[in-house]
């Protein structure tokens, strides 16, 4: 059968990105990479209790996982103050999702984060210019234990 060629499937050319879902987002004090490639989130935060201000964190991390999308994307993560005007910490990263079944995990490390006000702060996650997630982070005053 000279002249006959075996048909082969060509990869699909993707012209438009398929926006991913934000599967998970966690604010924590550290992210460790274990020997098996898994990640361990340390000191998960949902509130910042403090007897006085300012309160400092040597390190804070925002861990995100995106799935069910395809294309190249830009993520911006922010921690904003109670008035929504003050950005306390911000980081950005570009990432790729090559296939719909895949996922992308991003970790933003912030050093020397300082909260100078009590009140309801927020963590914000943007995909491009679109706000995809916003959750509260209360900084509250706690009385030190009496002696």
Per-region residue spans from a language model:
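Contiguous segments within soluble domain cores/interaction surfaces
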Residues: 2-147
